[in-house]
Amino acid sequence: MTSLAAGKPAPLGASYDGKGVNFALFSAHAERVELCVFDEQGNEQRFDLPARSGDIWHGWLAAAGPGLRYGYRVHGPWDPAQGHRFNPAKLLIDPSAHRVEGDLPDDERLHGGMWQPDRRDSAAVAPKSQVVDLRYDWRGDKPPRTPWGETVIYEAHVKGLTLLNPQLPEAIRGTYKALGHPAMIAYFKSLGISALELLPVAQFASEPRLQRMGLSNYWGYNPLAWFALDPRYASDPDRALDEFRDAVKALHAAGIEVILDIVLNHSAEIDLEGPTVSLRGIDNRSYYWVREDSDYHNWTGCGNTLNLSHPGVVEWARQCLRFWVDECHVDGFRFDLASVMGRTPEFRQDAPLFEAIRRDSVLSQVKLIAEPWDIGPGGYQVGNFPPLFAEWNDHFRDSARRFWLQQNVSLGDFAQRFAASSDLFARDGKPPSATVNLVTAHDGFTLRDCVCFNQKHNEANGEENRDGTNNNYSNNHGIEGLEANFAVIERRRASAHALLTTLLLAQGTPMLLAGDEQGHSQHGNNNAYCQDNALTWLDWRQANPGLTAFTAALIHLRRRIPALTRNRWWQEGDGNVRWLNRNAQPLTAAEWQQGAACMQIQLSDRWLLTLNATAEVVDMVLPEGEWRAVPPFAGEDNPVIMAVWHGPAHGVCVFQRS
């Protein structure tokens, strides 16, 4: 290995062809790029990348292969005023690497310098990129391609979901392998979900601040290598990629889609005081949004913001998404703080990355879900994403919680959210599935905590309970905490059932947080991003089987109601929906404006939801016909025909007309 051939500019990253490895790196402002390879003893050998095509630096190294450890040193101007922070003393991770060896330590040698370059060499402590052979036997794999109208999403953390499941072999608990194990697949199938949405599995790092407190980043929203499977979730770190692909293949065989939470908005380099380990040293001005004072626009709250309007960065991001679809066969993405993807810097529906996805024949066909906000100016964009995207709907979450737990939202607002928030999404040709309905998610209270806590309890996060939202719209039903008397426990159970029924029988795409169906609590912590412990791990031995069965019955019931699966907007008089009062009469204009009270929702003519959000028992006259309560509100062979429902406080029931 004495010199490199010219190689080719695509694809980005390190590509093994059986005879050698092609290296390609985007940097618009670099003046020279050195490829640094390391032997088993850590000895470094450097090669200049000999060719440049546009802004792609590239070269081909003969006789190199899988397992080769490498990094880059990138030469260019040190000119913070112009956004340039090149520093060849810093060994840099390939942003398209398919494996990264080593964690990101809290070590000053990784710092690139604030206003003057830090000349200390970082190679001894910097994580190393590694060449990977991407070949895999996908024979027999068939993506489920579940229609949006039939999709039920289950949001889960690989480790938190599986670590304490006694049905799994101990050696694979907490790993990718566990996801594809027959015991987990049987659980998913019995529950009825159609898509498993995983919190980030691309390699991430723990912030230095957390490391100093003895904590770690648990959720994974601090990306270090966007194209690399995080080895911490592998039973064998050397096989992380294949273990993940094995799980995807097994899930597909069971008809379950896999959606990845992807963090295309910031990097683990944090702010100017953070480490220089990749993008900052490769081309700071291109990869990040840089302010006139040379600091970063912090529209993510994480110290920096990716500039996904730059053509080179757009292509890098597109190739990242294609890697996950082409090489890992994932079925879609949930984009964290997705407004960043549309910034130019103002948000636009035709932003470069959105257009690149729309034009891509593969990416335009997978499921795309946006978290439609960031913390920058104009960052809240619910309902404004391009038609290809579904969006998390916080209006639904807040309205459902306020209806059942606060009793301070009108029937009209609740009905609007129940009917797929047509005021937000019935435009640009979007279907009702464009709203991803949720009552809880990984951030915020769990379902159980929504009915047990009025206040957040985040002291364990080390920020004196300042972190996490204060707008929880929760209700502890008179006693703060999990312990309560029988009467309070019953009220909590009724409220949890009502919220689950609202979520799973509303129009739109429902998303269930893993553990909500088991009664999992985080003891009031509504921002458990740094709690890799029993607070966040699902305790399967303590799961509530009655609540699990209730949830599963609702999901299976959902699939029987055409108004919920056809994915068409409800229109006046089309037979899909009727909104009725407690006397089975159409709601009046005055009743629509009432705060939380009683209503009946008739779906597809034969199905009826009765809702009593008051604190009193209410008799509700059912519409004309013979109505029987159905599971999970009655047994399979329920013979009781009702004309009046004696609705308990905070109660809900579903009926079918004979």
From Swiss-Prot:
Gene3D superfamilies: Glycosidases (3.20.20.80), Golgi alpha-mannosidase II (2.60.40.1180), Immunoglobulins (2.60.40.10)
Catalytic residues in the record: D336, E371
Record flagged with keyword Zinc: no
Coiled-coil zones: none
Keyword Lipid biosynthesis carried by entry: no
Known EC number: 3.2.1.196
Pathway: Glycan degradation; glycogen degradation
BP-aspect Gene Ontology terms: glycogen catabolic process
Record keywords: Carbohydrate metabolism, Glycogen metabolism, Glycosidase, Hydrolase
Name of the top EC class for this enzyme: hydrolase
Transition state stabilizer (site feature) positions: D443
One Gene Ontology term of the molecular function aspect: glycogen debranching enzyme activity
Reaction it catalyzes: Hydrolysis of (1->6)-alpha-D-glucosidic linkages to branches with degrees of polymerization of three or four glucose residues in limit dextrin
Family, similarity comment: Belongs to the glycosyl hydrolase 13 family.
PANTHER family, sorted: GLYCOGEN DEBRANCHING ENZYME
Role, per record: Removes maltotriose and maltotetraose chains that are attached by 1,6-alpha-linkage to the limit dextrin main chain, generating a debranched limit dextrin.
Protein name as annotated: Glycogen debranching enzyme
Organism of origin: Klebsiella pneumoniae subsp. pneumoniae (strain ATCC 700721 / MGH 78578)
